[in-house]
Protein backbone atom coordinates (compact mmCIF):
# COMPACT_ATOMS: atom_id res chain seq x y z
CA UNK A 1 0.00 0.00 0.00
CA UNK A 2 2.63 2.56 1.06
CA UNK A 3 4.92 1.44 -1.76
CA UNK A 4 2.23 2.10 -4.38
CA UNK A 5 1.45 5.49 -2.85
CA UNK A 6 5.13 6.40 -2.80
CA UNK A 7 5.45 5.50 -6.49
CA UNK A 8 2.50 7.76 -7.31
CA UNK A 9 3.80 10.65 -5.22
CA UNK A 10 7.32 10.46 -6.68
CA UNK A 11 5.88 10.49 -10.20
CA UNK A 12 3.65 13.43 -9.31
CA UNK A 13 6.60 15.60 -8.25
CA UNK A 14 8.97 14.34 -10.94
CA UNK A 15 11.45 12.56 -8.67
CA UNK A 16 13.08 9.25 -9.51
CA UNK A 17 14.26 6.62 -7.04
CA UNK A 18 15.64 3.11 -7.35
CA UNK A 19 13.69 0.15 -5.98
CA UNK A 20 16.21 -0.05 -3.14
CA UNK A 21 15.69 3.63 -2.27
CA UNK A 22 11.91 3.22 -2.35
CA UNK A 23 12.18 0.24 0.00
CA UNK A 24 14.39 2.24 2.37
CA UNK A 25 11.89 5.11 2.41
CA UNK A 26 8.93 2.82 3.14
CA UNK A 27 10.93 0.92 5.77
CA UNK A 28 11.86 4.25 7.37
CA UNK A 29 8.15 5.04 7.74
CA UNK A 30 7.66 1.62 9.34
CA UNK A 31 10.46 2.21 11.84
CA UNK A 32 9.24 5.72 12.62
CA UNK A 33 5.72 4.42 13.26
CA UNK A 34 7.02 1.60 15.48
CA UNK A 35 9.42 3.71 17.55
CA UNK A 36 6.94 6.58 17.78
CA UNK A 37 4.61 4.51 19.94
CA UNK A 38 7.26 4.26 22.65
CA UNK A 39 9.38 7.38 22.17
CA UNK A 40 6.96 10.02 20.84
CA UNK A 41 9.21 11.13 17.97
CA UNK A 42 6.49 12.87 15.95
CA UNK A 43 2.93 14.09 16.42
CA UNK A 44 1.98 12.38 13.14
CA UNK A 45 0.58 8.94 14.06
CA UNK A 46 -0.65 7.53 10.76
CA UNK A 47 1.89 5.90 8.38
CA UNK A 48 0.09 7.24 5.30
CA UNK A 49 0.32 10.75 6.72
CA UNK A 50 3.97 10.16 7.63
CA UNK A 51 4.62 9.35 3.98
CA UNK A 52 3.12 12.69 2.95
CA UNK A 53 4.09 15.01 5.81
CA UNK A 54 7.54 13.62 6.54
CA UNK A 55 8.87 11.71 3.52
CA UNK A 56 7.48 13.69 0.59
CA UNK A 57 7.70 16.97 2.50
CA UNK A 58 11.44 16.27 2.79
CA UNK A 59 12.08 14.86 -0.69
CA UNK A 60 10.67 17.85 -2.58
CA UNK A 61 13.68 19.82 -1.31
CA UNK A 62 16.12 17.50 -3.11
CA UNK A 63 16.24 19.20 -6.55
CA UNK A 64 17.27 22.48 -4.93
CA UNK A 65 20.32 21.21 -3.02
CA UNK A 66 23.68 22.45 -4.28
CA UNK A 67 26.89 20.87 -3.05
CA UNK A 68 27.88 17.59 -1.45
CA UNK A 69 28.00 18.19 2.32
CA UNK A 70 24.95 19.19 4.35
CA UNK A 71 23.84 19.51 7.96
CA UNK A 72 20.24 19.12 9.13
CA UNK A 73 19.88 21.16 12.33
CA UNK A 74 17.19 20.19 14.84
CA UNK A 75 16.55 17.10 12.76
CA UNK A 76 14.28 15.35 15.28
CA UNK A 77 13.85 11.76 14.08
CA UNK A 78 15.86 12.60 10.94
CA UNK A 79 13.72 15.01 8.95
CA UNK A 80 14.41 16.11 6.30
CA UNK A 81 17.89 14.56 6.54
CA UNK A 82 17.21 10.82 6.32
CA UNK A 83 14.86 10.92 3.29
CA UNK A 84 17.26 13.30 1.52
CA UNK A 85 20.23 11.05 2.34
CA UNK A 86 18.40 8.02 0.94
CA UNK A 87 17.62 9.85 -2.30
CA UNK A 88 21.14 11.36 -2.57
CA UNK A 89 23.69 8.65 -1.73
CA UNK A 90 26.42 10.80 -3.32
CA UNK A 91 25.93 13.54 -0.71
CA UNK A 92 26.98 13.55 2.95
CA UNK A 93 24.52 14.52 5.70
CA UNK A 94 25.19 15.37 9.33
CA UNK A 95 22.04 15.13 11.48
CA UNK A 96 22.17 17.28 14.59
CA UNK A 97 19.79 17.05 17.54
CA UNK A 98 20.10 17.61 21.28
CA UNK A 99 17.85 14.71 22.36
CA UNK A 100 19.48 11.32 22.81
CA UNK A 101 16.37 9.26 21.99
CA UNK A 102 16.18 10.87 18.55
CA UNK A 103 19.84 10.17 17.84
CA UNK A 104 19.46 6.55 18.97
CA UNK A 105 16.53 6.15 16.59
CA UNK A 106 18.51 7.64 13.70
CA UNK A 107 21.45 5.32 14.31
CA UNK A 108 19.13 2.32 14.39
CA UNK A 109 17.62 3.45 11.08
CA UNK A 110 21.08 3.74 9.55
CA UNK A 111 22.00 0.26 10.79
CA UNK A 112 18.79 -1.52 9.77
CA UNK A 113 18.38 0.21 6.40
CA UNK A 114 22.06 0.25 5.45
CA UNK A 115 22.39 4.02 5.00
CA UNK A 116 26.07 4.97 4.88
CA UNK A 117 26.08 8.72 4.14
CA UNK A 118 24.72 9.97 7.48
CA UNK A 119 26.42 10.99 10.72
CA UNK A 120 24.08 11.53 13.69
CA UNK A 121 25.39 13.84 16.39
CA UNK A 122 23.86 14.64 19.77
CA UNK A 123 24.58 18.30 20.45
CA UNK A 124 23.02 21.71 20.78
CA UNK A 125 23.73 23.69 17.62
CA UNK A 126 25.55 26.52 19.38
CA UNK A 127 27.97 24.02 20.95
CA UNK A 128 28.67 22.12 17.73
CA UNK A 129 31.97 23.00 16.08
CA UNK A 130 32.46 20.89 12.93
CA UNK A 131 35.92 20.02 11.68
CA UNK A 132 34.71 20.76 8.16
CA UNK A 133 32.08 23.34 7.24
CA UNK A 134 29.03 22.68 5.07
CA UNK A 135 27.80 23.50 1.58
CA UNK A 136 24.28 23.74 2.95
CA UNK A 137 22.61 24.16 6.34
CA UNK A 138 19.07 22.71 6.35
CA UNK A 139 16.32 23.04 8.91
CA UNK A 140 12.59 22.86 9.31
CA UNK A 141 12.86 23.10 13.10
CA UNK A 142 13.25 26.81 13.74
CA UNK A 143 10.28 29.07 14.46
CA UNK A 144 11.81 31.89 12.41
CA UNK A 145 14.50 32.40 9.80
CA UNK A 146 16.12 34.90 12.17
CA UNK A 147 16.52 32.17 14.80
CA UNK A 148 18.02 29.79 12.25
CA UNK A 149 20.59 32.32 11.03
CA UNK A 150 21.44 33.37 14.58
CA UNK A 151 22.10 29.83 15.84
CA UNK A 152 23.61 28.37 12.66
CA UNK A 153 25.72 31.23 11.34
CA UNK A 154 28.99 29.38 12.04
CA UNK A 155 28.16 26.25 10.03
CA UNK A 156 28.29 27.01 6.26
CA UNK A 157 31.38 27.41 4.12
CA UNK A 158 32.12 30.89 2.77
CA UNK A 159 30.21 30.01 -0.41
CA UNK A 160 27.65 27.83 1.39
CA UNK A 161 24.03 28.68 2.07
CA UNK A 162 21.09 28.14 4.38
CA UNK A 163 17.96 26.24 3.35
CA UNK A 164 14.98 27.20 5.51
CA UNK A 165 11.88 25.02 5.13
CA UNK A 166 8.83 27.10 5.90
CA UNK A 167 5.07 26.92 5.64
CA UNK A 168 3.32 30.18 4.89
CA UNK A 169 5.71 33.08 4.34
CA UNK A 170 5.52 36.14 6.57
CA UNK A 171 6.50 39.49 5.07
CA UNK A 172 7.47 40.69 8.54
CA UNK A 173 9.80 37.73 8.97
CA UNK A 174 11.35 38.32 5.55
CA UNK A 175 11.89 42.00 6.37
CA UNK A 176 13.67 41.21 9.63
CA UNK A 177 16.62 39.22 8.30
CA UNK A 178 19.80 39.97 10.25
CA UNK A 179 22.28 42.33 8.62
CA UNK A 180 24.59 40.59 6.16
CA UNK A 181 22.11 37.91 5.06
CA UNK A 182 20.22 37.88 1.75
CA UNK A 183 17.43 35.64 0.46
CA UNK A 184 18.54 34.55 -3.02
CA UNK A 185 15.68 32.18 -3.88
CA UNK A 186 12.16 31.38 -2.72
CA UNK A 187 10.84 28.06 -4.01
CA UNK A 188 7.19 27.12 -3.67
CA UNK A 189 7.13 23.41 -2.90
CA UNK A 190 4.29 21.16 -4.00
CA UNK A 191 3.74 18.18 -1.69
CA UNK A 192 1.24 15.56 -2.89
CA UNK A 193 -2.01 15.40 -0.89
CA UNK A 194 -0.99 18.43 1.18
CA UNK A 195 -3.02 21.62 0.86
CA UNK A 196 -0.90 23.71 3.20
CA UNK A 197 1.68 26.06 1.74
CA UNK A 198 5.30 24.93 1.70
CA UNK A 199 8.28 27.09 0.81
CA UNK A 200 12.03 26.66 0.69
CA UNK A 201 14.17 29.76 1.19
CA UNK A 202 17.81 29.83 0.15
CA UNK A 203 19.79 32.39 2.15
CA UNK A 204 23.42 33.41 1.78
CA UNK A 205 25.77 35.35 4.01
CA UNK A 206 27.27 38.43 2.36
CA UNK A 207 30.61 39.91 3.35
From Swiss-Prot:
Gene3D superfamilies: Vaccinia Virus protein VP39 (3.40.50.150). It is found in: Cytoplasm. InterPro entries: rRNA_ssu_MeTfrase_G, SAM-dependent_MTases_sf. It comes from the Bacteria. It is an enzyme of class 2 (transferase). S-adenosyl-L-methionine binds at residues 74, 79, 125-126, 140. GO terms for cellular component: cytosol. One of its GO terms (molecular function) is rRNA (guanine-N7-)-methyltransferase activity. It catalyses: guanosine(527) in 16S rRNA + S-adenosyl-L-methionine = N(7)-methylguanosine(527) in 16S rRNA + S-adenosyl-L-homocysteine. CDD domains: AdoMet_MTases. Keywords: Cytoplasm, Methyltransferase, rRNA processing, S-adenosyl-L-methionine, Transferase. Disulfide bonds: none annotated. Specifically methylates the N7 position of guanine in position 527 of 16S rRNA. Belongs to the methyltransferase superfamily. RNA methyltransferase RsmG family. This is Ribosomal RNA small subunit methyltransferase G. It comes from Shewanella halifaxensis (strain HAW-EB4).
Amino acid sequence: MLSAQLNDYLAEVGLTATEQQKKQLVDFVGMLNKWNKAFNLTSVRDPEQMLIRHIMDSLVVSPHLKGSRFIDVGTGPGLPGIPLAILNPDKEFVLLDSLGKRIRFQKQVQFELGINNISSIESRVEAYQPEELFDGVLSRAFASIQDMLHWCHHLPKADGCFYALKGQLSEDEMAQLPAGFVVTDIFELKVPKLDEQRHLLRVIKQD
